[in-house]
């Protein structure tokens, strides 16, 4: 029996990504059109930079870093993920989604390295090749980052990701943590790499947040809004050294395999964002 005219299920309009021209996917739960064909603004970042990413718990800081690790691995640039907020064993599942089940391959080639900076809090030994014995020891952390930086530089521009710096502020005086992050950021960038750190908003004083923003080339903020009973996530570029900041809050989709932003159908808006991410001075 044919379908009765007028009772057909509504179809979702096709929408093309303004960057790559491919059809966007549609998430019915979040009602978000997202692109899973191109890398969007991550491809505009320079190889060598420093960045701080802030936002409340659940805003998507860790998934964004996981997504970027996949981008860098696909392009032959090694990433080191210093896991302070959870054990690598718990991160491998979500990270496997963003790497499209190539995580083991990337780890085998040295393109992704997970460092256990979490297990020591429970007094147990981590199973990772690299792990901190005392996650409150900034000297140990500094030596470990330096060793990893030396090992990874031969593979390409290394990306050091510290997720997150929040626990460090609970163990040490804020000025010591700020000084440590400043030193590490400068060291990694001087070796042609990138240093990225996340921070839970509301856990550190605004003064120290501003000090960290001053240190970093880029400052990215994430937030969660409640809209008609649904959570909506947004992102904005709060600082870009040497460039005019793209000041608007941008809707962002955080999926299990893809992350995508939406600034509308006007390519000129994406061009403004691209210029904001141009190489910092």
Spans of model-derived segments:
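Short cysteine-rich clusters marking metal-coordination/redox-active sites
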Residues: 17-20, 35-38
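C-terminal regions of RecA-like/P-loop NTPase motor modules
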Residues: 244-281
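Phosphate-binding/switch loop-helix module in NTP-utilizing enzymes
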Residues: 120-183, 189
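Phosphate-binding/switch region of NTP-binding enzymes
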Residues: 193, 198-257
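Walker A/P-loop NTP-binding active-site region of P-loop NTPases
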Residues: 44-108, 112-116
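Short, non-ligating residues that shape and space the ligands of small metal-coordination modules
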Residues: 26-27, 44
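Loop/turn-to-beta-strand initiation segments
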Residues: 78, 110-111, 156-159, 190-198
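Residues immediately within or flanking Cys/His clusters that coordinate Zn2+
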Residues: 14, 32
């Amino acid at each position: 029996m044919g379908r009765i005219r007028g009772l057909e299920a509504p179809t979702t309009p096709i929408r093309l990504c303004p960057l790559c021209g491919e059809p966007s996917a549609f998430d019915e739960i979040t009602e978000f059109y997202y692109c899973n064909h191109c890398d969007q603004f991550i491809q505009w970042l320079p190889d060598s930079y420093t960045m701080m990413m802030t936002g409340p718990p659940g805003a998507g800081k860790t998934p964004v870093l996981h997504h970027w690790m996949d981008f860098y691995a696909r392009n032959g640039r090694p990433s080191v993920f210093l896991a302070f907020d959870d054990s690598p064993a718990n991160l491998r599942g979500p990270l496997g989604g963003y790497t499209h089940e190539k995580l083991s391959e990337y780890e085998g080639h040295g393109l992704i390295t997970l460092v256990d900076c979490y297990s020591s809090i429970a007094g147990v030994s981590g199973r990772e090749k690299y792990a901190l014995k005392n996650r409150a020891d900034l000297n140990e952390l500094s030596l470990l980052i330096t060793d990893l930086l030396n090992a990874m530089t031969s593979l390409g521009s290394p990306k050091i990701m510290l997720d997150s710096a929040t626990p460090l502020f609970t163990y040490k005086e804020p000025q010591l943590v700020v000084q440590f992050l400043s030193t590490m950021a400068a060291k990694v960038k001087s070796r042609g790499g990138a240093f990225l750190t996340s921070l839970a908003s509301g856990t550190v004083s605004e003064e120290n947040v501003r000090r960290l923003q001053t240190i970093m080339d880029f400052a990215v903020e994430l937030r969660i809004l409640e809209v008609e009973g649904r959570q909506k996530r947004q992102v904005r570029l709060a600082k870009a050294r040497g460039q005019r900041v793209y000041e608007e809050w941008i809707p962002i989709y955080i999926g299990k395999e893809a992350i995508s932003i939406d600034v509308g159908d006007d390519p000129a808006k994406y061009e403004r964002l691209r210029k904001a991410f141009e190489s910092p001075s």
